[in-house]
Amino acid sequence: MLDAPAPAPAPPDALLRLPNPLVLALIAVYCGVELVLQGADLHLWGRALWRPLAYQYGGFWAGLMRGGWLANYPGQTPAMFVTHSFLHAGLSHLLGHMIALVALANLLADRIGRLEFLALWMLSALAGAFVFGLIGPASQPMVGTSGALFGLAGLLVVREAQSRRADGQSLRAVLVSVLVWLLGLTALNLGSWWLQNGVLAWQAHLGGFLAGLAWGLARGLARDQRHPGPA
């Protein structure tokens, strides 16, 4: 057996907290980008072409990653792995992502540090883009923070399972908990797919979620190695 410190459960008031400064900074950047594009859409400044140009130059294009497409500028292929997450398909898309960010960040706030949060956020966004690039449609750009959000969800699933196991719950109970999480995330994807008329980058969700799972499992193994117990 291993005598490692158990992951702490999220406090009951976690969802009601004000997000930490890092999360607030991320929200400010995402909202700032969308505000600029909204103003252009409404002809308050700039040009109405700003949004399509932003998608063309900053969205994630699977065709570029797979090869055979010409980039609009040198370095677009690696850059789009990052830039796509700062763009959204409109206010409702942005609002949904920001609400999810606050909720997930607050649930994880007492479980991981800010640097680890940022590292996982970036890794999950990259993983989501990579999986979308592998199996997503080549002719449609992917934008949004969903890959990163599902990475946080993946880590939360692992941490919840580890917490239940450390509390002495049976393997069956832990697996049921994980299954409930997976069914909930699947229902969320199906609901989003229906609301968006079939336009959903589920590939990015999958990639980010797998990255979060892998992060959580690797984190647990590293913790167990630092705190070995009697055999």
Regions inferred by a protein language model and the residue ranges of each:
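A detector for small-residue-rich transmembrane helices and their helix-helix packing motifs
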Residues: 2-231
